[in-house]
Amino acid sequence: PEYYLTRSDWVLLFLGLKNKKVIFECHQYSRIRRIILKLVIKKKNVKIIFLNQELLRHSKFTNTVSNKLLVAHNGFDEDFISKGPINNGGKIVFVGSLTRFNEDRGIKILIDAFGNQEIKNQYSLTIVGGPEEEALELKKYILSNNVDAEINIVGPKARSEISKYLRDANIGILLNTSLNIHSYLFSSPLKYFEYIFSQLKVLAVDFPAHRELPYSENIVFFEEGNTDSLIKAIKNTSNVKPLQSDDVKTLTVNERVKKIIEFANS
């Protein structure tokens, strides 16, 4: 092939040392990966793609190799999402795994926010994702805390079913834990791109990784673990206009592939 594209450290090392043309996608770091990257970046046929700007910064590569480095965020699959959202006012949705690297994502703060009378009266919440036992725990949490609000915990759903939940909402939320450096600094959540392509407003916990996302100036941020900050952010979504399809047309998976091909040929 013209270029090998890999996310394997060992494939990168083997091909790089053989002077094969190889592009490595870097989504996070390990001690071994840092050693390998430092070694192979000296090879003329090695190029590296970083999932976000923070990953590039933490590589500590100098400007002498900048032509071999590319930042390419995730993108959305146009075949997955039905365009033309219903955009019902006041409907918040979270879609994704309820845990991250076996750690709590902080989902319960969403439920806590509905203890606020204004939020309870004006908004509803749908949480789509698993595992099933975590979804069950959230249902128990609602009951044990006597949360009398329109909150729907639907559990894990097939990918083919998720688009209907996006179309029936107008606010999407990004949650994660700062206990994991990947979540805090290096992620480029696929769900974000699906949210904005579905023309949802976006709420996000205030992490550097989320600040690096395309159109992050349109995200309403809140402080991790702070219910009052989340409540304020939910209310502030009324001041935000969702992105339109023309705004995000360059953020598709197909456009990402084109960018990578251009990078390979540069």
Regions found by a protein language model. Give the residues of each.
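Conserved acidic donor-binding segment of nucleotide-sugar-dependent glycosyltransferases
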Residues: S216-T227, I234-N239
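A short, active-site helix/loop in glycosyltransferases that binds the activated sugar's phosphate group
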Residues: F14, R31-R34, K42-I81, E212, ...
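Nucleotide-sugar-dependent
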Residues: F101-R105, S160-I162, G172-E194, A204-E212
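Short His-centered aromatic/hydrophobic patch
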Residues: L5-V11, C26-H27
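Conserved donor-binding/catalytic core segment of Leloir-type glycosyltransferases
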Residues: I49, F76, P85-G115, L125-T126
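C-terminal alpha-helical cap of glycosyltransferases
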Residues: A233-V240, T250-S266
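Nucleotide-activated donor-binding/catalytic signature segment of Leloir-type glycosyltransferases, i.e.
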Residues: G129, L136-L166, I171
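A short alpha->beta transition loop at the rim of the catalytic pocket in nucleotide-sugar-dependent
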Residues: N170, F197-Q199
